[in-house]
Amino acid sequence: MTILVAIDDSANAHSVVGVARRIATLFGTSVEGVHVQEDGSGQRAAAIADAANVPLRVRHGDVVSALRSEVKERDATALVIGTRVQREGPLPAGHVTLDLVSSLNRPIVVVPPHAADRPLRSVLVAVEGDGESHALSALYERLGNRPVPEVIVLHIVEPSELPPFSDSPVLEAEAFEREFMIRASHSVSADPSLIRFEMRVGDAPSLVCKAAHELDADLVVMAWHRSLSAGHGRLVRAMLSGTPVPIALVPIDADAH
């Protein structure tokens, strides 16, 4: 398995490479770099790769096409990329990032500008209301028998999805949350005591961004169908534009590696 990291000449490149190396350490794999040269670029990227002891390949042409080809040729298990500094407007993460996350059937880790340079101690996983989570399953499958960081399972409940509580609303709410915890942990055959569960009620896009900050997560993991126009797309857009935490987007139809 290889983690492929896209290295450019931007100020964010140090953070991107750092995140890629920490993810590779977490999953017990190696890191290889790629730089798509434009107008003679690449000196800074080469220096960053050399300082991090990451082998670097230089490619030419369209950035998106070159990165897609590199992922396929190296059979990379995941791609780590950075976003632009100004994340505003209809394309908050930049067209290159959005094209890649929508088209590649591999996990992609998106590193925002000024991501904290620190170990991956806490991973926040957004899960579905039924407790099933492709993202949570993928995380545990890739970890195997390696040490597990703190895993925080976050479930956002829309107010309309709450069951009607009768005479004992507090007790019934606790039972509702406990049942969800059991379903989520059983879906990955994990000991519930080793997973931290958090539940929020309200609008998912804003609450996931807020929870990532409040819970001091080092990485957010989300599964989605690679469509920005529906379903998880609204949540993914909000995360790409609203959180300083690296985000691992796991396609539900991802290739197994």
State where each predicted segment sits.
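Small/aliphatic-rich secondary-structure junction motif
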Residues: 1-50, 54, 122-167, 188-190, ...
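Glycine-rich, Arg-bearing micro-motifs that act as flexible, cationic patches
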Residues: 9, 81-102, 119-122, 221-242, ...
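Short beta-strand elements of ligand-binding domains
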Residues: 80-83, 107-114, 223, 247-252
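Charged docking surfaces used in two-component/phosphorelay signaling
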Residues: 58-66, 199-206
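A short, acidic, amphipathic alpha-helical segment used as a generic capping/interface helix at domain edges
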Residues: 182-185, 202-213
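Active-site charged/polar residues at nucleotide-handling catalytic sites that mediate phosphoryl
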Residues: 74, 215
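A short acidic, glycine-rich active-site loop
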Residues: 170-178
